[in-house]
């Protein structure tokens, strides 16, 4: 339970509960998570979303003063805002997870007390950067609900990513389980989404790994993303239609996570360079440059120009980089990013966020 919360004798939280969920990087294997593949992902302490739950008389979902803005200085202000930020803030995400959580508890005979609460959120995860900002808000909110209703021990860790994904699907967000697994577990996680496991268990096999196995990583992203890939991808439909090239390519991408796990355990950094670069190259062959977007491709190329390994963190918007030659190579990368107008940050790895109650459900 959140250390800031207290619980009454009947199991109801009587003080504020607050949880953070961190941005995630798909390290190897993405996007095979939605194609019965395997991935390795990690959460990073650079960016996070936080959700605060406070007991209240009525159930209240509080809009964020910036992300859910409804007051503008002019029509042009509104127009610019919508062009840069879109129509959606976090209120809909909080509403969706409340609905999905309640339905899950009903379907699984989990009794909930009748007290009400107010939910508010904040986030510093950059928009449109492929760092899982939406699912971070949802997973942080789920943690608050688990503690408020004192049901953490009744909902297995393995199924929580499904609950988070279900909330996002309510809103038409198309995604896979990888990001939600990373944010529910925290730290570095190997994930096996093979069809056998998904059909039998309803979820994958998730194996936490020691974060100290990772080499120093960097993150490249654009402060004002544009041209992030506007063309609708036909990869999913081609896979469903049995396209041999897409099917074999997705299998190859998934196998990179297996090879990557071995390379991490053996501290084989030259192999990691090879695997990271190959991951992006296969994605590029499948999706095509028009779909990926010129700016996204340039972020990868900037890193490669100095001999670093690079790939998307997600589906575009940011790139994870490994400089095997160390600080001197990072210096070269800093200069290339500055010239290209990109932001470069060293990755701070966020450790596992599971507590004793969570671990007992595994």
Swiss-Prot record:
pH effect on activity, per entry: Optimum pH is 7.5.
GO biological process: cell wall biogenesis; inositol metabolic process; pollen tube development
Co-factor binding details: Magnesium. Can also use other divalent cations like manganese or cobalt.
EC number: 2.7.1.43
Pfam families: GHMP_kinases_C, GHMP_kinases_N
InterPro entries from the UniProt entry: GHMP_kinase_C_dom, GHMP_kinase_C_sf, GHMP_kinase_N_dom, Glucuronokinase-like, Ribosomal_Su5_D2-typ_SF
Keywords: ATP-binding, Carbohydrate metabolism, Cobalt, Kinase, Magnesium, Manganese, Metal-binding, Nucleotide-binding, Transferase
Record-annotated site: Transition state stabilizer: 24
Free-text function comment from the UniProt entry: Sugar-1-kinase with a strict substrate specificity for D-glucuronic acid and ATP. Involved in the biosynthesis of UDP-glucuronic acid (UDP-GlcA), providing nucleotide sugars for cell-wall polymers. May be also involved in a salvage pathway for glucuronic acid.
Similarity remark: Belongs to the GHMP kinase family.
Name of this chain's protein: Glucuronokinase 1
Native source species: Arabidopsis thaliana (Mouse-ear cress)
Gene this protein is translated from: GLCAK1
């Amino acid at each position: 339970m959140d250390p800031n919360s207290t619980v009454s004798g009947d199991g109801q939280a009587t003080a504020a509960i607050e949880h953070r969920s961190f941005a995630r990087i798909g390290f190897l294997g993405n996007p095979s998570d939605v194609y019965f593949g395997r991935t390795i992902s990690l959460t990073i302490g650079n960016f996070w979303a936080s959700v605060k739950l406070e007991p209240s008389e009525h159930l209240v979902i509080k809009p964020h003063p910036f992300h859910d803005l409804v007051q503008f200085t002019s029509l042009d202000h509104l127009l610019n805002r919508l062009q840069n930020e879109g129509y959606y803030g976090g209120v809909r995400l909080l509403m969706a997870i409340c609905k999905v959580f309640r339905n899950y508890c009903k379907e699984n005979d989990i009794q909930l007390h009748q007290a009400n609460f107010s939910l508010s959120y904040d986030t510093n995860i950059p928009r449109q950067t492929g760092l899982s900002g939406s699912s971070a808000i949802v997973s942080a909110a789920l943690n608050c609900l688990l503690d408020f209703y004192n049901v953490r021990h009744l909902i297995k860790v393995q199924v929580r990513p499904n609950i988070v994904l279900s909330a996002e699907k309510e809103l038409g967000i198309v995604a896979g389980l990888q990001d939600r697994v990373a944010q529910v577990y925290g730290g570095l996680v190997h994930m096996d989404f093979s069809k056998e496991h998904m059909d039998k268990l309803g979820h994958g096999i998730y194996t936490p790994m020691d974060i100290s196995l990772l080499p120093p990583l960097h993150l490249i992203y654009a402060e004002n993303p544009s041209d992030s890939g506007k063309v609708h991808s036909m990869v999913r439909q081609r896979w469903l239609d049995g396209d041999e090239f897409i099917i074999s390519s997705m299998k190859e991408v998934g196998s990179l996570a297996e090879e990557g796990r071995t390379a991490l355990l053996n501290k084989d950094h030259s192999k990691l360079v090879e695997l990271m670069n190959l991951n992006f190259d296969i994605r590029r062959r499948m999706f095509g440059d028009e779909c990926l977007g010129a700016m996204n491709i340039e972020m990868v190329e900037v890193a490669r120009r100095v001999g670093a390994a690079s790939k998307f963190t997600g589906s575009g918007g940011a790139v994870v980089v490994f400089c095997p030659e160390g600080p001197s190579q990072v210096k070269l990368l800093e200069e290339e990013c500055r010239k290209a107008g990109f932001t470069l940050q060293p990755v701070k790895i966020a450790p596992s966020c599971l507590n004793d109650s969570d671990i007992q459900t595994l």
